[in-house]
């Protein structure tokens, strides 16, 4: 049985497409029973603190999705607010609002999510942060 070096593994990974890397990460998570989120927090920290620290790191969310649950009574004001927040054109914003529940923004920080939620609720929309 031949031994594969770290350099050979890195060269192999470098040759993969983004989709293949995503599939590789998923397969590694399943095989080893780990989460890539815990690895991103820092492998040394996860090993030193044990499983409890990994659970805490997973619980503290840093990126949020802003979801328009419904547009309420004032659809026009909500469309204007969505246009201002997302930079979409009138038709795209209207289609997005009418397709509620719909994700308006993904992966935003907590402050931006709260600001967006506040402006949309002032326009009459129902908004969720996930």
Swiss-Prot record:
Domain of life, per lineage: Bacteria
PANTHER family documented for this protein: 39S RIBOSOMAL PROTEIN L12, LARGE RIBOSOMAL SUBUNIT PROTEIN BL12M
Subunit structure and binding partners: Homodimer. Part of the ribosomal stalk of the 50S ribosomal subunit. Forms a multimeric L10(L12)X complex, where L10 forms an elongated spine to which 2 to 4 L12 dimers bind in a sequential fashion. Binds GTP-bound translation factors.
Family: Belongs to the bacterial ribosomal protein bL12 family.
UniProt GO BP: translation
Keyword Cell membrane recorded: no
Gene name of the encoded protein: rplL
Cross-referenced Pfam families: Ribosomal_L12, Ribosomal_L12_N
Molecular function via GO: mRNA binding; structural constituent of ribosome
Summary of the function given for this chain in its UniProt record: Forms part of the ribosomal stalk which helps the ribosome interact with GTP-bound translation factors. Is thus essential for accurate translation.
Keyword terms, alphabetized: Ribonucleoprotein, Ribosomal protein
InterPro entries, A to Z: Ribosomal_bL12, Ribosomal_bL12_C, Ribosomal_bL12_C/ClpS-like, Ribosomal_bL12_oligo, Ribosomal_bL12_oligo_N_sf
Record protein name field: Large ribosomal subunit protein bL12
Record's keyword annotation contains Ribonucleoprotein: yes
One of the record's GO cellular component terms: cytosolic large ribosomal subunit
């Amino acid at each position: 049985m031949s031994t594969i070096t770290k350099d050979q593994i890195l060269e192999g990974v470098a040759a993969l497409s983004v989709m293949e890397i995503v599939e590789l990460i998923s397969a590694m998570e399943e095989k080893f029973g780990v989460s890539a989120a815990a690895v991103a927090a820092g492998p040394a920290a996860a090993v030193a603190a044990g499983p409890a620290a990994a659970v805490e790191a997973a619980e503290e969310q840093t990126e949020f999705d802003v979801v328009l649950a419904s547009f309420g009574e004032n659809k026009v004001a909500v469309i204007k607010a969505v246009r201002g927040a997302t930079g979409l054109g009138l038709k795209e914003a209207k289609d997005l609002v009418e397709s509620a529940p719909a994700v308006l923004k993904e992966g935003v920080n907590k402050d931006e999510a709260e600001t967006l939620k506040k402006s949309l609720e002032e326009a009459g929309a129902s908004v969720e942060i996930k």
